[in-house]
Amino acid sequence: MLYIYIKTQNALVQRINFNLDSQELPQNILWIDLLHPSAAEIAFISSEFNLEFPTKEEREEIELSAKYWEDNATITINAHFLVRDLKSDEEDRNLIKLRTEIVTFATAKNILFTIRYNEFSTFEEIQARILASPKNFEDGFDIIDKMFEVRVEKDADLLEWIDKEARRLRTSVLEKKDEYSYDEMLKDISSLQELNMRVRDSLFDKRRAMTSLLKSDKIDKDIKQNLTIVLKDLNSLVEFSVSQLNILDNIQTILASQINIEQNKVIKIFTVATVAMMPPTLIGTVYGMNFKFMPELELHYAYPIVLGVMVISIILPLVVFKKKGWL
């Protein structure tokens, strides 16, 4: 599907759904958004505007040269977009799932071209801004500028959510709340660490793209000024994500220490029980021997006496352990 945004004579922006079979390209194009494009649609736009869009394999390459390249007439950017899926597990604990999608941006003749294979809230927000305030979007570079600005804001929202969840977890660990098991807490910590690293990778990806755009002579002064501000915000988010990872590592260390303490308590209980049972076991073993001459066995009260001695031998070590503070 091709969505074309054009500037009308009264300085408004109009969006049209373009059909290859029945329409010709309009004038005063601001942005061509290719959503789930067919091979024919990509070939048509490439031919009309003398563009070379990256293939699927090129879009997924991790080299810097595959993320951004520029020639005399065009700029092409392959950017990673984080898509947020909000799900709830059986206990109604909100968990964020993220997936990474690649969006291709290209500029030619001050027109922005985007290729994407999924819906993004960022695009919906930018589309609404363009239609509501068309004067703020003179060309395709203005759209790229606002696109990166919105994406950084959304990454900031994700980091804020991670920070809130990390603080909640830290409180649960320190106060030893029983609402979650250790397994669930470790799972949540691991999930938050994974989310943090995904967001940080996304920030690094945008920083590389914006740094390259700032070096381009195709970008005007006002856009570069705004990109510089956005880049400063992005760098502060990177620092914040690093501090978050340190906090999560600290929580994991505290939790691991608590698990070790609990394990030591269990081991101590079994150790005390073993030591306490050794004297009566010894007594029972002695009187279980099949010697012919054991005079005390002939006593009328031998059995209750031996049982009493065994009970005393159990209680005595426990009293000693209690006084020593081992229990």
UniProtKB/Swiss-Prot annotation:
Q: Which UniProt keywords apply?
A: Cell inner membrane, Cell membrane, Ion transport, Magnesium, Membrane, Transmembrane, Transmembrane helix, Transport
Q: What membrane topology does the UniProt entry give? A: Multi-pass membrane protein
- State whether keyword Transport applies: yes
State the disulfide connectivity. none
User: One Pfam family, short name please?
Assistant: CorA
One GO term in the molecular function aspect is:
nickel cation transmembrane transporter activity
Compartment(s) where it occurs, according to its Swiss-Prot or TrEMBL record: Cell inner membrane
Residues at the site labelled Essential for ion permeation: N264
- SUPFAM superfamilies in the record, alphabetically? CorA soluble domain-like, Magnesium transport protein CorA, transmembrane region
Q: Which InterPro entries match?
A: CorA_cytoplasmic_dom, CorA_MIT, CorA_TM1_TM2, Mg/Co-transport_prot_CorA, MgTranspt_CorA/ZnTranspt_ZntB
> Catalysed reaction per UniProt?
Mg(2+)(in) = Mg(2+)(out)
What transmembrane ranges does the database entry give? 269-289, 301-321
* CC terms in the record's Gene Ontology section: plasma membrane
Motif segment (Probable selectivity filter): 288-290
Oligomeric form and interacting partners: Homopentamer. In the absence of Mg(2+), interactions between subunits are weakened, and dimers, trimers and tetramers can be observed in vitro.
Free-text comment about domains: The central ion permeation pathway is formed by the first transmembrane domain from each of the five subunits. Mg(2+) binding strengthens interactions between subunits and leads to the formation of a symmetrical homopentamer surrounding a closed ion permeation pathway. Low Mg(2+) concentrations trigger both a conformation change within each subunit and a loosening of the interactions between subunits. This results in an open ion conduction pathway. In addition, this results in a less symmetrical shape of the whole complex.
**Cited function:** Mediates influx of magnesium ions. Alternates between open and closed states. Activated by low cytoplasmic Mg(2+) levels. Inactive when cytoplasmic Mg(2+) levels are high.
Family, as annotated: Belongs to the CorA metal ion transporter (MIT) (TC 1.A.35) family.
Q: What is this protein called?
A: Magnesium transport protein CorA
Q: Which organism is it from?
A: Campylobacter jejuni subsp. jejuni serotype O:2 (strain ATCC 700819 / NCTC 11168)
